Amino acid sequence: MLFLHDFHVSHTTLHYNKSEESIEITVRVAIDDLEKTLQTKTSGKLNLGIQKENKLSEKYIKNYFNSHLQISLNEKKVTYKWIGKEIAKDLHDIYLFFEISDCHSDGKIESIKIENTLFLERSDKQSNIVLIEFGVQNYNINFTKDYIKESIIL
C-alpha cells in the first residue's frame, strides 16, 4: 500500500563572499512547487527546464522572490539580482541563484534580517530552511507559516 504525504521544503543558503564583498544566494526547491505557486499568479504553465519553457519564467521567478524573500543588512532592506537557474540532476528540484553585490559599502555588516514567506500560500506545511554562512559563523533557521522573520546579530 502506498501512502502519500504532503511535504514541501525549500533550502536557501546565504553565503558571504569576502573577496567579492557580496552575498551569494542559492535556493533549492521542487520544480513542481515553484511551478504550481507561480501558475496561480501568472497565466499559463512555466514548463521550467524544457524546450517549451515560458519566455517570461525568469521574470516571474524574480518578481515572486523579491516579494517573498526579503533581506535586510544593518536594518536596511537590500535588493538582490538574478543570476540564473539550473535544473538538478534528479530533475525534481531547481536551483535558483541570486546575489547581493557591494553588500557592505556602508561599512561592516553587523546584522542580517530575513523575512521568508516562500510558498506559504501554497501549503500550511511548507518549511523554508535557511543556512547563513558568514565567515566562520553559520546559522540555521527554519521558517514556517508561524515563523516568518528572524534577525541575526553577527
Predicted segment positions?
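Bacterial N-terminal signal peptides
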Residues: 1-2
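N-terminal soluble domains immediately following signal/targeting peptides that reside
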Residues: 5-154
